[in-house]
A protein has these predicted regions:
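Short, conserved charged micro-motifs
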Residues: 32-35, 96, 205-207, 345-351, ...
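Activity-critical C-terminal alpha-helical subdomain
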Residues: 401, 412-456
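Short, hydrophobic beta-strand segments
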Residues: 335-339, 385-394, 429
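Extended C-terminal subregions enriched in glycine
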Residues: 346, 357-360, 394-405, 409-421
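Glycine-rich N-terminal segment of FAD-binding domains in flavoprotein oxidoreductases
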Residues: 18-113, 125-131, 223, 369, ...
């Protein structure tokens, strides 16, 4: 066995629905990645890639095959604090990155809702954040990559010389090579605070209208929606728009140290964050979540139109407020279906998505809407439009209804020319990269391939 292999292990998707048993490799250098791939080839296996294991479904699982974990590739290689760029190994997390650059007046150009994801995983999935509509996905800010191909060759790619090759790797799920290093342009910031505007809306149409109207003048924008009401109240929401502070702002230069950005250690000063998921468990049912969503609507109304200061970490990393919050969905887990649809179809498509929940009796406990702009990556999922992310509990008595709902969403996306996002998917049928190398595979790849054959 290869010295970087640790034997067979059972790995799970973050949503706790998918799992697989695989031969696991933990390389710590480019050379050990080359060694791991050689061992995989000689064993006649396929291989998937896994960073922090935060893909909701089966994108980082490979039943009966191999998985390369990037946890040992965790070094910051180079930081240019004057020019604003950083080179890191693939296993460096967003948390490690922002803590390294914020004291120098920089911030990662794109971050998801958790700081625990790895940069290699972020690039492989081409993650987006609350600023996709203005800054694009993370791939827009990648200036260089180191990639080990299936034959063991190491390629160092730069956008100045190999733009097409870089953009083919970004978002390809690691299906055309193993990413070992990433170079990123950083975002200049003058304060550790953002100026955040809160907005309340009475309906889905109003939510989308306000998001479209206010996003262009904002640096970040996101909307939470209530999926439980029927009629005109369906899709009512709370929106947040955030802006960077200028260098002459009274808060410029403040909260630039890591300690200033720490999330609170407790909820309301009473319940430790690490135990907060336990307090939510009694509400993890339809009546409880209807009440939770209503409470959020009511509590948000007095803040309508008000602005306040919030640290970057507090604004961006909502999923880290309650560590391990997915455990509220034990023992069966959750799935997320995220619909990306063109702008002109969004109002009708999202309205239909909520209607289908009422028809099937399967309600989303969390709905999040974002504005997007298109990109030109080979594995693009982002339109000039909107996305709607929907979290569903997995219940044994409702599995058939949940499957029907997800198949209806597949049909809906196909009808409007929409797309799926691999990092979140556990149930849909999406498009695979055209230049996929057969050495690289995953449970998601095989599921999508089977779904495409069924549709053909």
């Amino acid at each position: 066995m290869s010295p970087v292999a640790s034997g067979m292990e059972t790995l799970r998707g973050w949503g706790m629905v998918c799992h697989a048993r695989s031969r696991v490799y933990r390389p710590r250098s480019d050379e050990e990645v080359v060694e791991a791939l050689a061992h995989v080839r000689s064993a006649g296996l396929t291989v998937a890639h896994r960073g922090s294991g935060l893909s909701y479904g089966d994108a980082a699982l490979n039943q009966g095959g191999a998985v390369i974990l990037s946890e040992g590739l965790d070094r910051i290689v180079e930081l240019d604090a004057e020019e604003g760029w950083i080179r890191v190994q693939a296993g460096v997390t967003v948390e490690t990155l922002w803590k390294a650059v914020l004291p120098h007046g920089w911030w990662p150009p794109v971050v998801p809702g958790t700081m625990k994801v790895t940069i290699g995983g972020a690039v492989a999935m081409n993650i987006h954040g609350k600023n996709q509509f203005v800054k694009g996905s993370i791939g827009e800010h990648v200036t260089g990559l180191s990639v080990v191909r299936s034959d063991g060759s190491l390629e160092r790619l730069g956008v100045d010389r190999e733009r097409g090759a870089v953009r083919a790797v970004v978002g390809a799920q690691g299906l055309n090579g193993t990413i070992t290093e990433v170079t990123l342009r950083l975002q200049k910031v003058h304060s550790g605070y953002l100026d955040v505007l809160s907005w309340s809306t009475p309906s889905l149409r109003a939510t989308l209208d306000v998001l479209e109207e206010r996003a262009p003048s904002s640096d970040y924008a996101v909307a939470w929606i209530d999926c439980f009401p029927s009629g005109r109240g369906a899709g009512r929401g709370l929106l947040h728009f955030a802006h960077y502070l200028p260098p002459d702002h009274p808060r410029a230069g403040r909260a630039m140290e890591v300690v200033d950005q720490q999330l609170p250690g407790s909820i309301l000063g009473l319940l430790p964050r690490s135990q907060a998921w336990r307090a939510l468990r009694p509400f993890t049912n339809d009546p409880g979540m209807r009440l939770v969503n209503l409470g959020r609507v009511v509590s948000g109304r007095p803040r309508h139109g008000r602005s306040y200061a919030q640290t970057h970490a507090a604004f961006h990393f909502l999923l880290d407020y309650v560590p391990g919050w997915q455990r509220v969905y034990r023992p069966h887990g959750l799935v997320q279906y995220q619909l990306f649809v063109p702008r002109e179809a969004a109002r009708d498509a999202f309205g239909e998505a909520l209607r289908l929940q009422r028809v099937t009796g399967v309600r989303s406990y969390l709905g999040v809407v974002k504005r997007h702009r298109p990109d030109d990556f080979a594995a693009s999922y982002s339109p000039d439009g909107f996305s709607l992310a929907l979290d569903f509990p997995v219940r044994p008595g409702r599995l058939a209804a949940l499957r029907r709902l997800c198949r209806s969403y597949d049909d809906l996306l196909r009808d409007v020319g929409g797309a799926l996002y691999a990092a979140k998917d556990a149930v849909g049928v999406g498009r695979l990269p055209l230049d996929r190398d057969p050495l690289f595979s995953s449970n998601l790849v095989r599921r999508w391939e089977a779904g495409c054959r069924e549709e053909a």
